[in-house]
């Protein structure tokens, strides 16, 4: 009886090791351009068979663009804050939504940050098991002494 229990336990562990963690985002509003509203994924590039949507600009280039184009931080060199931007990229590599998820203390700053992210239009769609899918990307940012950096 103990041997059967051990065999069952071992087989369950083996099955779990082959399964894959997949996070689906719950989209409550209708977003024009989404390929499949019920299957928008938060992909994790470090997991097998998951590839995040990729922007043509590197994160360091996006940071540089934010610091160059967001007038609020250029005018407020002692300003400290943090926030988060989310972008939904459809299965065709098109940005269908860009918004602030965690707002900063300034609506003006939020608007300027989103406006910069909206200019990022060249994307490769995310992939799950080799198939192009709708996906969401998040960028947490911090502002220290008027300089924006990603966390």
Give the location of each predicted region:
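Charge-biased low-complexity segments
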Residues: 6, 18-151
